[in-house]
Amino acid sequence: MDTIELYEIDSDYIKYLSSFEQHLFRNKKVTQVFTRKYIGIVLKINGFDYFVPLSSFKEKHKRLCETKDFIKVGTFSVINLNNMFPAPINLCKKVIIADLKDIHYRNLVRSEYRIIRQKTQLILQNAKAVYEHKMINDGKSKLSQRCNNFKLLEEKCKLYAKKI
């Protein structure tokens, strides 16, 4: 993967995976009328395409330092690598920033993307380190407890991919 790109993930796949993993975020709360886009980046890890979702920047993020699994994208969003999950690439739709209708949202996404590109190496290194840490220390450290169950989700990803 030469350049990092932004993707939107299929909401049915999120619904499917979230029944197996408590750390997986849904893109719509029960009280919401509209779903928000589940946007992130895709990285190749252990032979799988891993979707790494972007999360909205919150007030608490201002005082947090970056760690192996937590990367700030300016003051626009954050990347929680512990929340990444495997996804069939055909369920990931590339985000074309120029096609985004809302100018404010387009500018936000453009700014996020610029910073993500600048941090590509850090993101790739940390993602692989988080993955390896989880596989080696499953449940034995705070970091591994925060992580999705990558092994389980890889199995569920394979099963889902066979059905599509």
Report residues per predicted region.
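Compact nucleic-acid interaction/catalytic patches
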Residues: K29-V33, K44-N80
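Intrinsically disordered, low-complexity and often Lys/Arg-enriched segments
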Residues: M1-D2, I164
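Residue-level detector of flexible, active-site-proximal loop/helix-junction positions
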Residues: Y13, K58, L91
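C-terminal terminal-subdomain/extension
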Residues: K72-I164
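An N-terminal domain-cap segment
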Residues: M1, E8-F34
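Residues at the C-termini of beta-strands that transition into short coil/loop
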Residues: D10, S55, P88
